[in-house]
């Protein structure tokens, strides 16, 4: 049972800490839409250093490394960091809400990460990432498309919180946090997604 006194992101993070292996077992590598998005991201940024927030099992980082990019893998869940380190990768714990992002970075990647933040936390994360990126740097991320927010126990059998977005409400937040939209693509899957790429203004 989810307590109203607990932060939704912290509850979600505990779910990942508890069931990281279950997540890995139930999640494959990047699908065709994600691969196409990662390819476009790589083509846009060239061979630069990429900060990845929410690396999870590291599958997206591995794909980009195959394209010749250097990816700094991070995750707020220690269980995922330990999993990546055990596989021979450098990785560190980083909470996008509070931790120093380092930099300046030429590019940042956050696939299926920011969708766990509420709207105020999301805007704050965009500001923090902008401060850690060089002018003209590129930020790529994905969100679930829709209205409102909801809890789900899908995939992990534990509660995770999701905030849904639509393009008309997303664009002003990007502009207010000094990001110029490169592209916002609608991707249909089991659920509709928004694949977003923006450039630091």
Residue locations for each model-derived region?
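A conserved beta-strand element that flanks and buttresses the S-adenosyl-L-methionine
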Residues: 109
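Short catalytic micro-motifs in class I SAM-dependent methyltransferases
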Residues: 112-116
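Class I (Rossmann-like) S-adenosyl-L-methionine-dependent methyltransferase catalytic domain
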Residues: 1-51, 56-103, 120-124, 128, ...
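Helix-to-beta-strand junctions that scaffold the AdoMet/dcAdoMet cofactor pocket
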Residues: 118-119, 133-134
């Amino acid at each position: 049972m989810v307590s109203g006194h607990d932060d939704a992101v912290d509850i979600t993070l505990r779910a990942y800490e508890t069931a990281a292996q279950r997540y890995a077992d139930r999640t494959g590598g990047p699908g065709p839409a994600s691969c196409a998005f990662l390819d476009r991201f790589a083509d846009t940024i060239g061979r630069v250093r990429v900060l990845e927030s929410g690396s999870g099992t590291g599958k997206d980082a591995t794909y980009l490394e195959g394209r010749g990019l250097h990816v700094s893998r991070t995750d707020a869940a220690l269980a995922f960091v330990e999993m990546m380190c055990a596989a021979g990768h450098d990785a560190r714990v980083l909470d996008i809400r509070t931790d120093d992002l380092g930099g300046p970075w030429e590019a940042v990647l956050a696939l299926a990460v920011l969708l766990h933040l509420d709207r105020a936390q999301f805007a704050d994360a965009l500001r923090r990432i902008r401060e850690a990126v060089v002018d003209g740097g590129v930020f790529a991320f994905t969100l679930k498309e829709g209205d409102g927010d909801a809890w789900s126990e899908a995939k992990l059998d534990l509660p995770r919180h999701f905030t849904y977005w639509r393009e008309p409400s997303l664009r002003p937040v990007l502009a207010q946090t000094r990001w110029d939209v490169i592209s916002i693509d609608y991707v249909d899957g089991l659920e509709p997604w928004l694949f977003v790429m923006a450039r630091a203004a």
